[in-house]
């Protein structure tokens, strides 16, 4: 059930990314009402999905030994042929891009919170979180171009992550699950 749940949560994350990124790339004005929820849905779904490859290993407390670490027996590296390792790479990349896409949309809001904060520590916290956002035309132009780049990056990333996740089934030795149509499917 763990790999099935992994695929389900990745699919939920893909839905959030595609809703937000495709609507941004097609310049849909009504996107602003749903983009924050779709991007947050992606982040929380990817966090949930990221746990299932660890649970799939069977012994969660042994997850440490999957990572390469220095030892006295020479360098030990992970098995790059394992689809679970590629799941980790795919989910890590997908999570990073989704987090950047989500947080770049929060920058103007962080600046608003900074400007409305009454306490000094809150002003300082939101000032750091806003990365010096002032709302100038230059900042809005850069924000728009960054959002377009991240949306353009995350849309094909959805397809690549989906392909890597489907390799879990395409490369398995379970009868009935081995087929070459899974990665593009």
PLM feature spans:
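Hydrophobic alpha-helical membrane-insertion segments
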Residues: 42-56
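N-terminal regions that are enriched for targeting/export leaders
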Residues: 1-12, 76
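Transmembrane alpha-helix boundary signature
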Residues: 53-65
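Hydrophobic alpha-helical transmembrane segments of multi-pass membrane proteins
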Residues: 5-9, 54, 86, 96
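Long, contiguous internal "core" modules enriched in hydrophobic/ aromatic residues
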Residues: 75, 80-185
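Flexible loop linkers connecting adjacent transmembrane helices
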Residues: 24-39, 62-74
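Central hydrophobic cores of alpha-helical transmembrane segments in multi-pass inner-membrane proteins
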Residues: 9-25, 47, 98-101
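Membrane-interfacial loop-to-transmembrane alpha-helix junctions, especially the N-terminal start
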Residues: 33-40, 149-155
């Amino acid at each position: 059930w763990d790999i099935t749940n992994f695929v389900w949560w990745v699919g939920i994350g893909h839905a959030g990314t595609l809703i937000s990124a495709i609507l941004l790339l097609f310049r849909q004005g009504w996107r602003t009402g749903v983009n924050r929820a779709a991007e947050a849905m992606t982040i929380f779904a990817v966090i949930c999905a990221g746990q299932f490859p660890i649970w799939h290993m069977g012994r969660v407390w042994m997850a440490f030994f999957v990572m390469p670490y220095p030892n006295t027996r020479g360098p030990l590296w992970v098995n790059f042929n394992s689809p679970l390792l590629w799941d980790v790479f795919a989910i890590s990349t997908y999570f990073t891009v989704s987090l950047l896409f989500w947080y770049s949309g929060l920058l103007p809001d962080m600046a608003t919170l900074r400007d409305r904060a009454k306490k000094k520590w809150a002003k300082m916290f939101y000032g750091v979180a806003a990365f010096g956002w002032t709302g100038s035309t230059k900042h809005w132009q850069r924000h728009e171009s960054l959002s377009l780049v991240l949306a353009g990056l995350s849309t094909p990333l959805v397809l690549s992550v989906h392909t890597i996740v489907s390799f879990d089934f395409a490369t398995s030795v379970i009868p009935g699950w081995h087929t070459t149509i899974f990665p593009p499917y």
